Amino acid sequence: MEKKDFPKGTKPREIFVYTCERIAEPLIPLGYKYRKSKNDIYKKDGIFVFSFYFSPSIRFGSTTFTAFFDVSSPVIAQWRSEQEGTEETYDGIVGTSIARLTHRYDDFPRYEVSTLLERERSIQEISGQIQDYALPFFARFSNLPKLLDDVEQEGFFPHR
């Protein structure tokens, strides 16, 4: 997808969606799907769903957002439902700001994407965090015994 500069007066939602599409682009060949309606990029892999979602603040012309990741499992949700005796329950395992996977001090950054320069910087930063930190974090779920041992000893985020 080409870099795109938007004319003044472009709706914030259009800029936000374009930014999400650009972030999703390199993940599509890896089996991820982008859902414009949910502001997320997700992939089902075995019993897990790995996702990235973007929380926009597009009110009153603002074009800022926060980027998050999430690991969930319908299997875990079913187990919790049986344990709790309820029909609906939470399927989440772990999720927070993507930046929390890094050693960054500001671990809940808001990304401004109104100008071409800001948008390109944000796309590069988030894409880098996904490639360098989130995808390796998701890969840990392919070896559950080791993951459980690691989490028991150090938690999900040993660098925190």
Feature map (PLM): residue ranges:
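Intrinsically disordered, low-complexity regulatory regions enriched in serine/threonine/proline
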Residues: 1-18, 22, 34-36, 42-160
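Acidic, metal-coordinating catalytic segment for phosphate/diphosphate chemistry
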Residues: 27
